[in-house]
Amino acid sequence: MRLIHLSDLHLGKRVNGFSMLEDQRYILKEILRIIDEERPDAVLISGDVYDKAVPSAEAVLVLDEFLCQLAQRKLPVLMISGNHDSAERVAFGGRLMERSGVYVSPVYDGAVQPIVLHDAWGEVRIYLLPFLKPAHVRRCFPDETIDSYTDALRVAVGQMEIDAGVRNLLLTHQFVTGAARCESEELSVGGADQVDASVFDGFDYVALGHLHGPQSVGGEHIRYCGSPLKYSFSEAKQQKSVTLIELAEKGQVQVRTVPLVPRHDLREIRGTYLAVTGKSFYDGTATDDYLHITLTDEEDVPNAIGKLRAIYPNLMKLDYDNTRTRGAVQLEEAAPVEELSPLDLFAQFYRQQNNQPMTQAQTDFVRDLIETIWEEDAP
C-alpha cells in the first residue's frame, strides 16, 4: 500500500503581511500532479489544515476544491485537526463526507475507532487522533493521572486497544521530544508540550503534523512530513517535500520524499545596498521570490524598502547588520529590564517587531504619550 503524507497546509496564512493563498493553491496543484504520477492508495493530512480556528471564506474554498479533486480520483483521504484548527469546524459534516471517502477526525471524546483499508497483505488500521492537550484527555478519563502531554497521549493511545498482529498507522499532531522546531510554530513555555516517542511503540507508521521541517524522530517510521511551503525565514534553507510511505507486510515500511517546487521561494540575501541592487547580483535570479534582505551599509539608506521593491517586489523584511545594530543588540542584552525606562522598553519592542528603530518623530510621540499616562495616574 502506498500512502501520501501531508500536514500543516495552514490555508489562509499571511507571512509578514503577504497572503499566501495563491501560493497555496499553486502548491496543492503540484501535490495533485505528484499524486497522479505516484498513484497512492490514500492521502493522509495530519492537521493544521487552516492557519486560524476561524478560517477565511477563501481558505475554506481552497480546501474544498482540494478535497473534491482527491475524491474525484477515488482516493480515500484521512484528515485530523491541529492546534491551529477548530476541531469542531474541521469535523463538521464529517459523517457525510465519509460517503465520498473523506474521513475526518471527530471532536475527541475518548474513543478513536480506526479506518480500515485493505491490500494484498491484509488490513491496515489507521487511527485519527486530533491535536490533544492534557485537559482534553482528563475530561474523558478523570480517574487517570495525567500531568503532562506524554501522559495524555499514553492514555489516549492506550484506549485504542491496538491489535499487534495487523499493521497500524496513527495520524497525530503533537511535538515529539527531540524534533527540531521553526519560528513559525507555536511554542510552549519550557517545552511542556513535548511527547515521548515511546508512546507510539505500537504503530508501524506515525504520520505527524505540527512541525514544519521534514524529519523523522525516534525512528524512521515516526515522521513529520513538514509544511508544503516555507512560512518563516527560519525555514529558508529547508527543502519542502511530499512524504510517500510504502507499506508491505507487517514490519516492512519504506519512506521516501518527492521535492516540492513553490510558485515563489522564500529566501534571504545580504550585502550593501549597491551590491544587492546591482544588475550582476540579481540577474538570472527569481527577483519575485519572497525575500528577507539584510543591508550591511553603515548608514541607513533613505526609502530603502521602496527602492528595493522596484527590483524585488515581494520584499517581506528588511534589516541592517552594521556596527550600530550590533551595538544596539549588545546593549539590549546587557541592560536588565528593571533598569530600563518605559520608553526604552517600548523602543526595544518596536525594534524587535519591525527590525528597525523608531524615527525621532515616533520617539517623541511615544515619550509624550507615556508622560501623559504617568500624569493621569499620579495622585
Residue map of PLM features:
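N-terminal active-site segment of His-dependent metallophosphoesterases
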Residues: M1-C68, Q72, T363-T372, E376
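Divalent metal-coordination and catalytic microenvironments
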Residues: D8, L28, D48, L63, ...
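Accessory, non-catalytic peripheral segments of nucleic-acid enzymes
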Residues: E37, A42, L247-P379
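Short beta-strand segments at enzyme active-site cores
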Residues: D41-G47, M79-S81, R167-L171
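His/Asp/Glu-rich metal-coordinating catalytic cores
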Residues: P55, H84-G218
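Catalytic-core regions built around general acid/base machinery
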Residues: V62-K74, Q194-F203
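A short helix->loop->beta-strand "cap" motif at the edges of active sites that frequently abuts
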Residues: Q72-V77, V166
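Binuclear metal-dependent phosphoesterase catalytic core
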Residues: V112-A120, V124, L129, I222-T287
